[in-house]
């Protein structure tokens, strides 16, 4: 990430399948990667983030739903904690 970009998370809860797909496509168009079913992340400049926010707002329109766009600074990113309990590999053991 360049000094001008911040890691940006987009998380959404949208009932309409068509609108939800268009939101996902918009995130992909801006180079974000899917991290959960309804969550994307990736580096965005303030300008690109503003454009994406406008596009997401236009896409949601008056439909029922919620979209959170969350830029994260490097300091906060370094303080993150991840917890992962992955399922066992098929045919493997949990030794």
Locations of regions flagged by a protein language model:
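Basic nucleic-acid-binding interfaces
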Residues: 2-9, 14-95
């Amino acid at each position: 990430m360049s000094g001008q970009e911040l890691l940006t998370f987009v998380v959404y809860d949208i009932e309409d399948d068509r609108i939800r797909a268009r939101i996902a496509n918009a995130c992909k168009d801006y180079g974000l990667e899917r991290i959960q079913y309804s969550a994307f992340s990736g580096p965005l400049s303030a300008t690109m983030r503003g454009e994406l926010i406008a596009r997401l707002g236009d896409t949601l329109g008056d439909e029922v739903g919620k979209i959170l766009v969350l830029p994260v600074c490097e300091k906060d990113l370094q303080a993150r904690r991840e917890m992962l309990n992955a399922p066992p590999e098929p045919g493997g053991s949990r030794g």
